[in-house]
Amino acid sequence: MHQQLKKMSLIGLILMIFTSVFGFANSPSAFYLMGYSAMPFYLFSALFFFIPFALMMAEMGSAYRREEGGIYSWMNHSVGPRFAFIGTFMWFASYVVWMVSTAAKIWVPLSTFLFGTDKTQTWALGSLTPTQTVGILAACWMVVVTFIAVKGINKIAKITAVGGIAVMGLNLVLLLVSGAILLLNGGHFAQPLNFTLSPNPGYQSGMAMLSFVVFAIFAYGGIEAVGGLVDKTDKPEKNFAKGIIIAAIVISIGYSLAIVLWGVSANWQQVLGARSTNLGNITYVLMTSLGATLGQALHLTPAASALTGVWFARITGLSMFLAYTGAFFTLSYSPLKAIIQGTPKALWPSVMTRLNVNGMPAAAMWLQCLLVGVFIVLVSFGGDSASAFYNKLTLMANVSMTLPYLFLTIAFPFFKAKTHLDRPFVIFKNRPSTLLATGVVLLVVTFANIFTIIQPVIDSGDWNSTLWMVGGPIFFSLLALGIYESYRRRMASGALVMEKIGRAHV
């Protein structure tokens, strides 16, 4: 396994990027919120965020191809250690929020696989509400994941491979079945084509549509995570940049195509208008509709068509459960590795950086498990309904995920100003193109977050949601500053002591 990772092929790198970035559940969420009108937003985010940002990562990764610290090393060499630590810590924190959200969401596909539909909103342990029950299960899930992950990277890689194959299979099913339905129905779309107006009443205001940009950006998140693989890629000076570019183009086209394909089988008002539909179960609602519509197009009986839809949902539930599991195992280790093993060891207590017999920072992983578990319990016992619970967690993850991109983008002009680097791949060949790309990406990410944060207040005076979205990132930023300043003072104090000892000997 070590040798395979050490020399990853171009195809292997592309597949790794694809499975890290392309989430099958993102296009159903987009169709639910915006219908076909989500596609222009996804294209906009691809052109003005994802593709230029991916090219920046390709340049930095190729230049720092021998570094093992991933994005921490890139920002450290480009700007400085304090900036790099705060940015990397925020990146790590965004994945903590992602784990809080996903540990709750993962029970929806499992329920769908077992029962043919989402039953999580009816689950109850004793006197606990469904939301509290899912929260307890999510905390237990985090313990199980950590217990297995600390046993070594081989265990993580095997589980991740299964998840990657599962999600790629789902994308193939959507493409082939939608194509078959379109042919059988004479080119008729269940949802009339309209790329300018959302069928969702809650996403027809200008403010709501602008806030949707953050969902599109979130869909393209994760490409920076492959930064730690650059030194394990075969001929990284050529293949790393090439892999990122190919994957970025395929992903950009793939999302837009998927959004259109959902309209082949699902009419928004008929399929998605129910109160029980939310961002947590939308994928399974749409896949049920896909299977049922295929049955109808094949002129099966209503009962047979409905049964086809149920089995599509069950297969999707199993595939999504495996995909979430694979992603969960990878992201419970990879960001933590960067923040613990990529940064100076003196930043952390020695027990945090100590590796177990399997080469894993076990103590740090268990502490992360505790942190995620506490957040899960706090949010799930907050009194929200299950639907609001899922939607709030999704918004928290969207905002937190996009903030680290600001740090990486700000670091890029400083990286370009370095004159001593061997740069095997250069796409931004002069200062104006560098500043233009940096400025565009910064504007897109900044305004997307601002619109998302203020939208609940403008639409309904909902300060609670706004405070939840703002509070998490601020807390982690202040925590990062506190940790780094404590480290800096300890280093300065140690240097002063050594200087006094040296003078005493003189």
Regions found by a protein language model. Name each.
Residues 2-7, 355-358, 402-454:
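C-terminal membrane-solvent junction of multi-pass transporters and transport-like membrane proteins
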Residues 29-40, 122-131, 154-163, 375-408, ...:
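Transmembrane helix-loop boundary segments of multi-pass membrane transporters
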Residues 55-57, 67-138, 328-335:
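Hydrophobic transmembrane alpha-helices that form the core helical bundles
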Residues 73, 249-328, 349-389:
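TM-loop-TM module centered on a large, flexible mid-protein loop between adjacent transmembrane helices
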Residues 135-185, 244-249, 394-407, 430-440, ...:
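Membrane-interface loop-to-helix entry segments
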